[in-house]
Structures are given as C-alpha cells and as structure tokens.
C-alpha cells in the first residue's frame, strides 16, 4: 500500500502520465494500465479498461493490495540426490577398483538444474616381482541449465555497479521488482512484452561439460634400492555453452519492436544505416530468435620419468 501511495503521488506530479508511460521502453503497473485503455476488442466493442477515474482507481487498487512475493514464486525448496557405487576385486597378480556416481540437483529456481555422471577405474598389474603396471581412467559428464544472460553493458566507476541488457537473473529480479506487479501479466521492457516466468522458459543456457583422463605408470625395480618409473597421462576436456533465445522471448521481440514512429525512433535495438542520413531504423531480426554456441576444448599430454634410490 505504501508503494502504491508513492506511485500515486508521483502520478499526481506528472511522472506517470499517459504520454510518458504508454511508449516508455520500460513500464510497470501504470504503463500496463494505459495499454489496456488503448486496447480495443472488435468482438465486444470495448476497450481493455475504461478511460474513467473509477476504472483506473479500481485497477490501481488491485495492484495496491497484490503484494507479490517474488522470492516465494521464483525460488523453491528442492532435494538433490547423489548416488554412488564402488567395486573392487583382484588377486596377487592383479587388483581392480571401479566406482560410478550420479548427482541430480533440481536447483532452487527455474532453469537451474544440474546432472552429473562420474566414473573411475583403477587397475594394478604385478607383472613380475620387479615390474608393475598401474592404469587409471577417469570420466565425468555434467549437464546444467541456467537463465539466459548477456555480457555486462557497463560498470559504474564510482559505485562498482554492473549493468546488463536483458538481465533475467531471478535473484536480482526478485530483489528489485515491485510487489504491485501481477506475476501472470506482461509488462513492458525494451519496448516489448515481458514476464519473468515466460522469459525463463524462452531464454536459457545449456552447459555440457566432458572431462576424460587416462593415465598409465610403469615401475621397474632392477635392484632392491633402486626404482625406475615412467608415467604417461592424457587429459581431454570440452565445455559447450549454448544460449537459446526463442522468437517469443523479450530479447528477440525487442529487436523488432517498432509499433509506431516514436518507438521506432527510440528503440536502440533497431538498425539505422550510417551511410544514409535520412534512412529509418529497421529490424535486423524480422522473425526468429538467437542461437549462440560457444565451445572450449583442451587436450594435454604429460610424460614423466623418475628414478629413486632408497637404502
């Protein structure tokens, strides 16, 4: 109620007028109210909201008593599972050990689940009293989801605040969003419709991480006090990051938001030909969304030979 009281006072002072809010790049309760007032339904012959003081006060009163708990809606309790199994066997000539594990963490908020699979195999062969061979293999695979994000658009040199375009971090959104907003409604962001739950379903990251390591060590004791060993290891790892931004996401819609001349001229996500001074801004994304894939690979080899003397 206190927040809506401040909003009403700002409206009375001219901050939330129809002209400034209807075509604003970002707007909330007042912007949505003005959009409803301008939304005509030919089937019923009525607007989404009557342009009367009574209708506007009734709409704002609903927002006043809404008190949306964003943390409760965006975050939830979850149970993570971790299962593992190990086996060992062997004789005097050969010993074996193997272990496998699986982890499933559904996460505390939407699009934050993680699954991980790991395996370890260790084999030791006593070829003779003087020669032994140890072979080790490790493999791990992790699949993870996260909300979509973009690189930082600027850092405040005084406060250190980092700003991002199209930021949909659930914690940041819950911390900074007004409780007067309807969690099921769409509001204006970047001149396009925005709902945090809809955006999390249409703008997300997928991570696939693979790590494999193979190692072999050969030991030889020519005499009791001397041991020679040769070790060779190979490690391969790859990380694939895929960001999917569907055609229905706010980010994709912002790149083609040009409902009228005012929005077209002020939307920074439209393209204007620098070689044509009189050209109008156009969209570079008339349909579809974005698919961005980044892949990191690493291959490493390690060879080592040692000699030790112990009397």
Which residues are covered by each model-predicted region?
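Outer-membrane beta-barrel architecture
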Residues: 84-88, 99, 122, 215-217, ...
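Transmembrane beta-strand segments that form the barrel wall of outer-membrane beta-barrel proteins
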Residues: 100-106
């Amino acid at each position: 109620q206190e927040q809506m009281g401040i909003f009403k006072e700002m409206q009375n002072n001219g901050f939330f007028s129809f002209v400034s809010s209807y075509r604003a790049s970002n707007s909330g309760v007042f912007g949505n109210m003005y959009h409803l007032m301008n939304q005509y339904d030919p089937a019923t012959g009525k607007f989404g909201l009557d342009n009367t003081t009574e209708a506007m006060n009734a709409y704002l009163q609903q927002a006043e008593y809404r008190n949306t708990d964003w943390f409760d809606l965006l975050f939830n309790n979850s149970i993570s599972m971790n299962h593992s199994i190990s086996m060992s066997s062997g004789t005097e000539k050969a010993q074996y050990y193997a272990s496998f594990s699986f982890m499933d963490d559904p996460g505390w908020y939407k699009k934050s689940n993680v699954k991980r699979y790991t395996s370890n195999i260790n084999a030791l062969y006593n070829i003779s009293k003087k020669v032994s061979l140890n072979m080790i293999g490790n493999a791990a695979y992790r699949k993870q989801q996260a909300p979509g994000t973009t690189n930082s658009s600027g850092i405040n040199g005084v406060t250190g605040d980092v700003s991002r375009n199209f930021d949909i971090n659930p914690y940041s959104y819950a911390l900074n969003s007004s409780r007067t907003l309807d969690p099921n409604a769409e509001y204006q962001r970047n001149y396009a419709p925005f709902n945090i739950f809809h955006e999390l379903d249409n703008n997300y990251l997928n991570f696939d991480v693979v790590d494999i390591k193979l190692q072999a060590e050969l030991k030889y004791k020519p005499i009791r006090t001397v041991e020679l060993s040769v070790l060779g290891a190979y490690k391969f790892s790859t990380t694939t990051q895929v960001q999917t931004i569907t055609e229905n996401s706010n980010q994709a819609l912002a790149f083609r938001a040009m409902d009228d001349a005012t929005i077209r001229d002020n939307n920074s996500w439209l393209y204007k030909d620098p070689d044509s001074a009189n050209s109008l801004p156009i969209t570079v994304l008339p349909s579809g969304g974005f698919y961005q894939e980044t892949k990191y690979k690493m291959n490493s080899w390690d060879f080592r030979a040692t000699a030790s003397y112990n009397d």
